[in-house]
């Protein structure tokens, strides 16, 4: 059983059994199971509830739904959670301290939240191209969310960078809206599911640029041209484009917990054992921010459930 020394708290401050950071599939699953176990818990979510799936056009691999849009699935999950009337802080987490066996969570609205345990389920952040003017053109021709911004480019020319499932899925989606979709991939072979690739290859308004990387973003007030460089012979070419959607992977969203000195893998993802317990007692990790081999909706939910059941047993 976890013993908490909370002598530094004032009498009107609540100390929760559990605070869950993130309301994606992992966090929502944790919260549902936690509420059913009668844990006194709270959730912190500074972005759209539902997590990364709300930026996905179509989900076809989640049991119970042959085909469902990402926003619809995220809303279904979140409405299920809301039926339990949880405490939710709709704020961004700034940092976490650990004092006298109590976790202190600082939010961007100056609120401070106290808890015996934490399940950290913040998912991942989109990896940027890392080239000049990328931040400058964000919202002016650079977007990391096709489902959010595709309608702005109806009948126009767009590009997608990447070769995984996300890139291929969003290229398929954009092909139904844009005049032309340029798919830019640094390799000859895609990492995406073969069925998705075959589907994309059958779409007439998709142009493939394989063995190519984005070298330069060109434009004045907005993005106008993308310069590509061949990974084979270094030759360069240019594409006139209205918007570029990079889908080149993700990075761990670990900035608020770096001061805790959690054990991380070489890519910055948080290490947890089979029960999602980190090297700090009472601090658990679940979902895509955890170091693991596979990142799917189903695996995130499994992480979240495992973590909260361990919390239930330890409280």
Curated annotation (Swiss-Prot):
A cellular component term from Gene Ontology for this protein is:
cytoplasm
Q: What is its EC number?
A: 1.8.1.9
Annotated binding of FAD, by residue: 45-52, 288-297
Query: Which cofactor(s) are needed, names only?
Result: FAD
Fetch the InterPro entries from UniProt.
FAD/NAD-bd_sf, FAD/NAD-binding_dom, Ferredoxin-NADP_redctase_2, Pyr_nucl-diS_OxRdtase_2_AS, Thioredox_Rdtase
Q: Where in the cell is it found?
A: Cytoplasm
* Record GO terms (molecular function): thioredoxin-disulfide reductase (NADPH) activity
List the disulfide bonds in this chain. Answer: 145-148
Enzyme category, top tier: oxidoreductase
Which biological processes are named by the entry's GO terms? cell redox homeostasis; removal of superoxide radicals
The entry assigns this protein to a family as follows: Belongs to the class-II pyridine nucleotide-disulfide oxidoreductase family.
NCBIfam families with a match to the protein in the record: TRX_reduct
Quaternary structure note = Homodimer.
Q: What is the recorded name of this protein?
A: Thioredoxin reductase
Organism the protein comes from: Mycoplasma genitalium (strain ATCC 33530 / DSM 19775 / NCTC 10195 / G37)
